[in-house]
């Protein structure tokens, strides 16, 4: 599958601040008649949004320690990247070459993007922002690494300091990032994580997504948070029922 097709497939991982369309041409939003409560009624392709039993995001609590969980192997590299305001979020499309290995499977990094506030919560508390690093295996499986971010007045995020000056403010605009971008700069020192099986967090809400959420949060400055929220005041989906799913925690 070519990269543009992958990007369309994964568009549901982003969210919108005003009514936008998916690759099916169907509008969806986070408020009003196009909002989450009606997603499943907007298009037959969105049915999982209403009836799916493995939906994301979820509240992370009572995670069970599983000492057998393997570390996530990161093989990220610096390279050219393009930033786009896709009408859902600010998305960075990365050059080929960065990937993770998890449970013996290689997942190539396709893109990363942001949600404000975070989609997922920890014991009922949302974070100020989250970056979702979206990966795809050779056989089409999706794995998303989530890094929660918390506002810290005196500590800007180094990678955001590189990215934000190029941030496109108008839907459809793209910008080449002048510096090389290494997504590894987002990763916390402590690689402990939570994991569960979920879905894309927006239409079509496709299930079977492997979620890997770091337990350690990373900082961003108030100014960095405001710069994003000025474009997307809210682009996150309400929490979904676990329906008996278990959340596991690594050591």
Regions found by a protein language model. Name each.
Residues 2-251:
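Alpha-carbonic anhydrase
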């Amino acid at each position: 599958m070519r990269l543009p097709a992958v990007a369309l497939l994964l568009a549901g991982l982003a969210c919108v601040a005003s009514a936008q369309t998916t690759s099916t041409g169907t509008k969806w939003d986070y408020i009003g008649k196009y909002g989450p409560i009606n997603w499943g009624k907007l298009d037959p392709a969105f049915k999982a949004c209403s009836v799916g039993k493995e939906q994301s995001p979820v509240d992370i609590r009572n995670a069970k320690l599983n000492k057998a969980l393997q570390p996530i192997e990161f093989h990220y590299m610096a390279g050219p990247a393009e930033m786009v305001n896709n009408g859902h979020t600010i998305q960075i499309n990365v050059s080929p070459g960065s990937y993770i290995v998890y449970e013996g499977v290689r997942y190539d990094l396709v893109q990363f993007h942001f949600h404000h506030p975070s989609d997922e919560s920890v014991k009922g508390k949302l974070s100020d922002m989250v970056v979702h690093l979206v990966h795809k295996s050779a056989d089409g499986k999706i794995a998303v690494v989530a890094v929660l971010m918390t506002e810290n007045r005196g500590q800007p995020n180094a990678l955001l300091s590189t990215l934000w000056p190029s941030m496109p403010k108008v839907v459809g605009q793209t910008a080449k990032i002048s510096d090389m971008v290494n997504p590894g700069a987002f990763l916390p020192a402590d690689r402990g994580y939570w994991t569960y099986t979920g879905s894309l967090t927006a239409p079509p809400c496709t299930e079977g997504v492997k979620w890997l959420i770091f337990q350690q949060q990373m900082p961003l400055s108030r100014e960095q948070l405001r710069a994003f929220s000025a474009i997307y005041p809210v682009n996150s989906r309400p929490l979904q029922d676990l329906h008996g799913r278990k959340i596991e925690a690594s050591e």
